[in-house]
Curated annotation (Swiss-Prot):
Binding site for beta-D-fructose 1,6-bisphosphate: 24, 95, 108-109, 137, 246-247, 270, 291, 352
Gene: fbp
Protein name: Fructose-1,6-bisphosphate aldolase/phosphatase
A GO term for molecular function: fructose-bisphosphate aldolase activity
Residues holding dihydroxyacetone phosphate: 24, 137, 270, 291
Length: 389
């Protein structure tokens, strides 16, 4: 009998930035080794299998187990791993040591404590391929565009037209990360309403995608916003995602296809700029130019009786060389704008950066415009009916 005994398996991807080697460029091997030592001790006690990787200065813990989502033991294990890595980071005087650990001690769940988390639970299919995405220098809304392409755009995913098990479409769970609420939208019927929301990178993020015909989980994203948790800028959220592929879900090639055409995402230097999301292999996930451009890696696994077979470093494929060239061209063009919009994020997305502190120094130096007065709606009105020069 298989070790799973027909039980559901849970895939948990939990990430944190606990220190970078030379700025924000890389989580060094010493930190990964510290995490691996903690996870190895928990095999067969808490988890079934694990893989530790990095994207830029973020450590990503990929774990399989049978304890379900939001399990205290699994989350506590990840927290301990990050704590041990933080100890090493402080010994090495790494930049930003422990920066994503926003609480002094673990309290049952990493959500709201700094680390990002994406988890899904399912019964293994006859063959269970999954793709784990890890990003650096961007935030959860970076997945809005590619997830829409994967699960709602037939020009990207031919299976939406040709696969009878997908033709009924997918359901999107969208989170208002500012208002702390969510909504479910069905595609293709509610596609336009979905786009009205997820095109807003400031407020709305896709959290999960479900197959409509049986409500089976298809994808999940970490949507934790560090700035709203900490109350100040402590780094970009650097999201992770899990996507199931094949046999009733988009094929692996359809899951990867959206990244063949790089799109602009918020983040990059100081979390304050728009820039391209560049797909790279694990070895190239070391953003240096202006702390970027933002990177994304894609690791393919086969889940076999709860074990993680792999990974296959999917974006290392030569087929994405042109995408990388495009991303660098996009970076060249938008970098010319320097501190000006549209390279610089709008003021509403800079609220938790250091910009407001800079502007505070000018507050007392502003004076009213002569002959004009502001009205509450943000427009202007004349003080009297006469002409004002």
């Amino acid at each position: 009998m298989s070790r799973m005994e027909n039980n559901k398996v849970t895939i948990s991807v939990i990430k944190a930035d606990v220190g970078g080697l030379c700025g924000h460029t890389l989580a060094p091997d010493e930190l990964l080794e510290a995490c691996e030592a903690v996870l190895e001790e928990a095999v067969d006690e808490i988890i079934l299998d694990y893989y530790v990787t990095r994207c830029g200065d973020d450590i990503d813990l990929i774990m399989s187990h049978k304890l379900g989502c939001d399990n205290e033991k699994v989350h506590g294990l990840a927290w301990r791993a990050f704590e041990e890595a933080t100890k090493v980071a402080k010994e090495l005087k790494l930049y930003g040591a422990g920066q994503d650990l926003l609480a002094d001690s673990f309290s049952g769940n990493v959500r709201g404590m700094g680390p990002g988390c994406a988890e899904m639970e399912f019964v293994e299919r006859k063959s269970e391929p999954i793709v784990v995405f890890c990003c650096d220098k961007t935030d959860p809304t970076a997945f809005n565009y590619p997830l829409f392409k994967m699960f709602a755009d037939p020009f990207n995913t031919a299976g939406l037209v040709f696969d009878p098990s997908m033709i009924s479409g997918f359901k999107f769970e969208v989170h208002d990360v500012v208002g702390h609420k969510k909504v479910f939208l069905d595609t293709p019927e509610e596609m336009y309403m979905l786009l009205a929301l997820i095109g807003d990178y400031e407020k709305y993020a896709i959290k999960r995608v479900y197959r409509r015909r049986d409500n089976e989980i298809a994808a999940v994203v970490s949507t934790e916003k560090l700035n709203y948790i900490a109350g100040e800028y402590v780094g970009k959220d650097d999201p992770v995602a899990i996507v199931r592929a094949q046999s009733g879900f988009p094929a692996v090639g359809e899951v990867l296809e959206p990244f063949a055409n790089p799109h602009f995402v918020p983040g990059w230097m100081r979390g304050s700029h728009w820039g391209p999301l560049m797909p790279v292999g694990e070895e190239d996930a070391t953003p240096t130019r202006f702390d970027g451009p933002a990177r994304i890696i894609a690791l393919g696994f086969q889940v076999c009786d709860g074990m993680l077979i792999g990974p296959n470093d999917l974006f290392a494929d030569k087929g994405f060389d042109k995408a990388r060239e495009k991303a660098l061209e996009m970076a060249d063009i938008i970098r010319r704008m320097g501190p000006f919009q549209p390279h610089r994020l709008p003021a509403t997305m800079m609220e938790y950066t250091t910009v407001p502190k800079v502007l505070e120094a000018l507050e007392d130096r502003f004076i009213p415009l002569e002959g004009l007065e502001l009205i509450e709606e943000g427009g202007i009105t004349r003080k009297d009916r006469g002409d004002v020069e």
